[in-house]
Amino acid sequence: MKKHGMLNSHIAKVLADLGHTDLIAIADAGLPVPDGAPKIDLSLTAGVPAFRDVTSLVAGEMAVEKVIAASEIKDANPENASFIESHFSAQTIEYMSHEEFKRLTQKAKAVIRTGEMTPYANCILQAGVIF
């Protein structure tokens, strides 16, 4: 049995398989997952697990080069927008329209669905390298 780090075997495998510039999406409960995109559904009930918790844990297990979010989060969900800005202050943060964001999830190696029930609480983490 694994003792440390990411215990969810599906997420651990995706993280281990990431290469430079690969994408992994962390989504609220309402984000549509494109057909064919691998979905890891962690949602248990409204708000559990939270977007911030899942994002922090996943990001802590990988080299993050860039974070992508919908520009709408800034006005519709300032608390989670502030979280993204502060948690990823050392990384590039790119904003795009929610429609563009949804299209980009088609390229994600996985979409991790949380129980988050606040608007636009989604981000895409682009893998960096550790050397």
Curated annotation (Swiss-Prot):
Pfam families, sorted: RbsD_FucU
Species whose genome carries this gene: Bacillus velezensis (strain DSM 23117 / BGSC 10A6 / LMG 26770 / FZB42) (Bacillus amyloliquefaciens subsp. plantarum)
Q: Where in the cell is it found?
A: Cytoplasm
So what does this one do?
Catalyzes the interconversion of beta-pyran and beta-furan forms of D-ribose.
| Family to which the UniProt record says this protein belongs | Belongs to the RbsD / FucU family. RbsD subfamily.
Q: Which HAMAP family match?
A: D_rib_pyranase (MF_01661)
Residues binding substrate:
28, 98, 120-122
Q: Which Gene3D superfamilies match?
A: RbsD-like domain
GO molecular-function terms, A-Z: D-ribose pyranase activity; intramolecular lyase activity; monosaccharide binding
Question: Does the record's keyword annotation contain Isomerase?
Answer: yes
> InterPro entries of this UniProt entry?
D-ribose_pyranase, RbsD-like_sf, RbsD_FucU
Q: Which GO terms describe its biological process?
A: D-ribose catabolic process
Q: How does it assemble?
A: Homodecamer.
Main subcellular location:
cytoplasm
A single GO cellular-component term from the record reads:
cytosol
The gene it comes from is rbsD
The protein's name in its UniProt record: D-ribose pyranase
Record's keyword terms, sorted = Carbohydrate metabolism, Cytoplasm, Isomerase
What EC identifiers does the entry list?
5.4.99.62
Which biological pathway?
Carbohydrate metabolism; D-ribose degradation; D-ribose 5-phosphate from beta-D-ribopyranose: step 1/2
Q: Which reaction does it catalyse?
A: beta-D-ribopyranose = beta-D-ribofuranose
Annotated catalytic residues: 20
